Design a protein with these regions (language model features):
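Short loop/helix-cap segments at secondary-structure boundaries that form the rim of catalytic
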Residues: 41-42, 82-91
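Acidic, metal-coordinating helix/loop segments flanking the phosphotransfer/catalytic sites
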Residues: 31-49
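Two-component/phosphorelay signaling modules centered on CheY-like receiver
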Residues: 11-30
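A short, hydrophobic beta-strand element within the central beta-sheet of small alpha/beta folds
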Residues: 71-84, 94
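Conserved phosphotransfer microenvironments
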Residues: 14, 35, 48-69, 80-82
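C-terminal output helix
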Residues: 98-108
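Conserved acidic carboxylate
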Residues: 7-8
Length: 110
């Protein structure tokens, strides 16, 4: 499994997602609360998956996805009301609320 970065504006949300992934044997490389932190975390990595919420204090998930280096995918976890009907491009969307198994299998699929 590649590098996993968990990124949510609320630290508790990030911890919860991180704990689910770790509990299922998926190592998390970094936990971030802003888009800038995510981009800084990707500097030393060649590829990976960013598991993200919809909005940060400094940017949206779409802006973050546009700035991610090649080799990185973004998995958005948000209510479908946030993104349904929009063309999300290369962003993979997982509707919240979700089942733990859905999160784990989606991360492994990417």
């Amino acid at each position: 499994m590649g590098n996993i970065i968990v990124a949510f504006s609320k630290p508790q949300d990030g911890r919860n997602i991180r704990n689910i992934l770790v509990k299922h044997g998926i190592q998390v490389t970094a936990s971030c609360t802003s888009g800038a932190q995510v981009l800084a975390s990707t500097d030393d990595l060649r590829s990976g998956i960013v598991v993200s919420g919809y909005r940060f204090g400094d940017m949206t998930c779409r802006q973050l996805a546009d700035q991610l280096p090649p080799g990185f995918d973004l998995l958005l976890i948000a209510s479908p009301s946030r993104w349904s009907g929009e063309a999300m491009g290369k962003i993979v969307c997982l509707p919240a609320p979700f089942k733990m198994g859905d999160l784990v299998s989606t991360v492994r699929m990417i």
